Amino acid sequence: MLNVFFLTSLFYAASATTYVTTNNHIEMPIYQKRPLSEQMEMIDILDLGDRPRRQAEPNLHNSASKFLLEVYNEISEDQEPKEVLHQRHKRSLDDDILISNEDRQEIASCNSILTFSSRLKPEQLDNELDMHITFNTNDVPVDLSLVQAMLRIYKQPSLVDRRANFTVSVYRKLDNRQDFSYRILGSVNTTSSQRGWLEFNLTDTLRYWLHNKGLQRRNELRISIGDSQLSTFAAGLVTPQASRTSLEPFIVGYFNGPELLVKIQKLRFKRDLEKRRAGGGSPPPPPPPPVDLYRPPQSCERLNFTVDFKELHMHNWVIAPKKFEAYFCGGGCNFPLGTKMNATNHAIVQTLMHLKQPHLPKPCCVPTVLGAITILRYLNEDIIDLTKYQKAVAKECGCH
């Protein structure tokens, strides 16, 4: 409930433009170019960070992007978990949704999911047996705590059948080592005819990369086929260059971060501190009186409040949704309380007490059912972030 109050009130405070009310619907006007400080205020409220510092246009058709798009669609449509017909380490290509039951458990328990697209190492030679891929882990928010990370490599049927069984191993290149030393991270046994995703636990490795971002721009992994002379290409492993297949290797990381209210409190403290330092230690001036933006209805009900990312000039890095209804509750809780007000027995008693003793407070029109907002955005050209804001939308209102 606090999330709804803070989110709605801060949206009002972020703009000096008057809102228009028609039929209890508060509509955002055509957005005019605002000062940078006001644009950043909107971004900070939704915890979307700064405008991404990307060097190239992100690819929405690779496997990393498609995975998070599938997650977003499942969350947004409130679909029931689908039955997965294959084991976690060997998913079928026929299963268009790349999400397993284990994934859904992590999705339900985390509030941020990030995918990291892979790139082929620039020095990679066509005749090399091993595959060298790199990952960009910059621009990940420092207040996120990693829970689990998985590397996913897609395997097609092998081009040669001289080895019915072989092992795929993943190694991490050690930092600042000139002798090209690698440390093994994990192995998966497979067959020449196998088609599906191979997965490797990369939790400790990704956590190390995130804690040591300054060591190198990109982090390298080496994928090899056991002790054989079989190349990863001949074994059927899809490389980052195989853009037509949309099955490139990628990392998915499940994170937990602080609640939105905690972030807003830290943001306010930081800004108050900056103002005091700029003003020589004097306290900040009192805030301006609140502006009456609308005339509330007579009775408690839910009112619309549309947030449009294009009008906020954020559509270039917010992938989905393009806009959403935040809603808020408004109106009075006056006697008699009708059925449409969803009044509790306590609210009815409190209303009667207020009639007899006016100094006692009346019930308040508040959210009774809360929903979540899910936002999908770029962090840079290689990383996509899905963040869930729990209890941030007023689904129903009532007198409490």
Swiss-Prot record:
Name the domain of life.
Answer: Eukaryota
- List localization entries: Secreted
Supply the SMART domains for this chain.
TGFB (SM00204)
Alphabetical UniProt keywords? Cleavage on pair of basic residues, Developmental protein, Differentiation, Disulfide bond, Glycoprotein, Growth factor, Secreted, Signal
The intrachain disulfides are 300-365, 329-397, 333-399
Q: What is this protein called?
A: Protein screw
**Which protein family is it in?**
Belongs to the TGF-beta family.
Keyword Glycoprotein assigned to the entry: answer is yes
Q: In which tissues is it expressed?
A: Ubiquitously expressed during early stages of embryogenesis, but the effect on development appears graded and is restricted to the dorsal side of the embryo.
Signal peptide residues are: 1-16
Give the record's GO biological process terms.
Answer: amnioserosa formation; BMP signaling pathway; cell differentiation; digestive tract mesoderm development; dorsal/ventral pattern formation; gonad development; imaginal disc-derived wing morphogenesis
**Coiled-coil intervals in this record?**
none
The residues that carry sugar chains are: 165, 189, 201, 304, 342
Could you tell me what this protein does?
Answer: Part of the signal that specifies dorsal cell fates in the embryo. Acts together with dpp.
Q: Which stretches are tagged as propeptide in the UniProt entry?
A: 17-277
State one molecular function term (GO).
cytokine activity
